[in-house]
Swiss-Prot record:
Belongs to the PTH family. One of its GO terms (molecular function) is tRNA binding. The keyword Cytoplasm applies. One of its GO terms (cellular component) is cytoplasm. It comes from Yersinia pseudotuberculosis serotype O:1b (strain IP 31758). It holds the Pfam family Pept_tRNA_hydro. The keyword Hydrolase applies. Disulfide bonds: none annotated. This is Peptidyl-tRNA hydrolase. The lineage of its organism: Bacteria, Pseudomonadati, Pseudomonadota, Gammaproteobacteria, Enterobacterales. Its EC number is 3.1.1.29. Monomer. Keywords: Cytoplasm, Hydrolase, RNA-binding, tRNA-binding. It is found in: Cytoplasm.
Length: 196
């Protein structure tokens, strides 16, 4: 069983970004809150939108930073500091170029894969990379020069369905992570592949 006290969904703020691939982490947190009859409310001292859930018997805070993606660490560090939450008690959900739509993967620690949100969180947590990541696959445009436009673009309906299905399975696997631990959650989530 894993002790997670804070689940963060990365995003850019504002209506123009709400449906873009870069906001996949926030889609996951929003759905997680909704499934537990909660809604995120703005809390300025944490520079984001927050909610509180009881998940698998654990008291868990949800956070979607209201800052731009590359400043996500400000919100995460503020909440972690206030509630005395350690990096290894944090799960950060984010979009992942290196995973296809319809799939998601869990990992603990590691690099940031060039993801500016992860980079800033690691820096603001005292350069500590040892937090959990939920990597939600969005696919890759195939060319490095196209990445910015791709992550800030909206997926076509067929891809959106795949991403939504992977998020749905990720929510089920979050419960597995909390109840039965990382290995069981990884085994289940990594075997999942949504079909169109």
């Amino acid at each position: 069983m894993s002790s997670i006290k804070l689940i963060v969904g990365l995003a850019n703020p504002g209506a123009e970004y709400a449906q873009t691939r870069h906001n996949a982490g926030a889609w996951y947190v929003d759905l997680l809150a909704e499934r537990h009859n909660q809604s995120l409310k703005e809390e300025s001292k944490f520079f984001g939108y927050t909610a509180r859930l009881n998940l698998a018997g654990q008291d868990i805070r949800l956070l979607v930073p209201a800052t731009f993606m590359n400043l996500s660490g400000k919100a995460v560090a503020a909440m972690a500091s206030f509630y005395r939450i350690l990096p290894e008690e944090i799960l950060v959900a984010h979009d992942e170029l290196d995973i296809l739509p319809g799939m998601a993967k869990l990992k603990l620690g590691g690099g940031n894969g060039g993801h500016n949100g992860l980079k800033d969180i690691q820096n603001k947590l005292g350069n500590n990379p040892n937090f959990y990541r939920l990597r939600i696959g969005i696919g890759h445009p195939g060319d490095k020069s196209k990445v910015t436009g791709f992550v800030l673009g909206k997926p076509p309906a067929s891809e959106q369905t795949l991403i939504d299905n992977a998020i749905d399975e990720s929510i089920r696997c979050t419960e597995v992570l909390l109840n039965e631990g990382m290995t069981k959650a990884m085994n289940r989530l990594h075997a999942f592949k949504a079909s169109a």
